[in-house]
Amino acid sequence: GEGYLTKRQGRGTFVTATKIIRKVHQKDDVQSFTQACAENGMKAGARVVARKTVAADRDLASFFGLDEGSDLILVSRVRTADGVPVLFENNYYPVDGFEFLKDIGLSNCSIFEAVGERTGRYPCSSDPCRLEIARAGIDAARELKVPVGEPLFFMNAGFLDSNGERFCYGRQYYVGSRYSFDI
């Protein structure tokens, strides 16, 4: 495989080696952050950072079966456990059927529950789902209260409902020292 170029300020441009991908089968169930906190005896919190319409990039368009550049609703939130920032959540939804996301209260609640209460649809599986390590950029570092460059878990996940229909797509940043995955 081919690498890609990475610019490092003050150091130059380097070729980054292609990553090896190992498939680990994930169970066909989706646990929300709110549920994970409850199971660990912690109180989940959420603060909305942004809520806006964005143009679908190639990957998002492919997942939703839309044309590249089609409108999607992006909801970005910081999720906390007992008041400590753990997750910078970026969920993308198709506009059709999810217009209410522009107006409803999404602080200190499960977005999956909020959507389910209005649509009867809940995420039941994720495909694709990829977990890798990424360094915190300026936005993620600010929201998660970690240094720029801090290693974070980065999850790309497409969520499907019980009928196998596309539900939402998440691009999530987790603080590794504050979160663990049971795969």
What do the PLM-derived regions correspond to, one by one?
Residues 51-53, 78, 158:
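Residue-level recognition of beta-strand microenvironments
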Residues 1-68, 98-124, 180-182:
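HTH-adjacent hinge/linker in prokaryotic transcriptional regulators
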Residues 65-68, 81-84, 95-97, 102-183:
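C-terminal regulatory/effector modules of DNA-binding transcriptional regulators
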Residues 46, 75, 85-91, 174:
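A short glycine-rich, His/Asp/Glu-containing loop-to-beta-strand
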Residues 34-35, 79-81:
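Short, charged beta->alpha transition segments
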Residues 6-8, 79, 160:
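Short glycine- and Lys/Arg-enriched binding-loop motifs that mark or flank ligand-binding interfaces
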Residues 4, 90, 171:
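Short, surface-exposed charged micro-motifs
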Residues 73-75, 154-155:
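Short loop/turn microsegments at loop-to-beta-strand junctions
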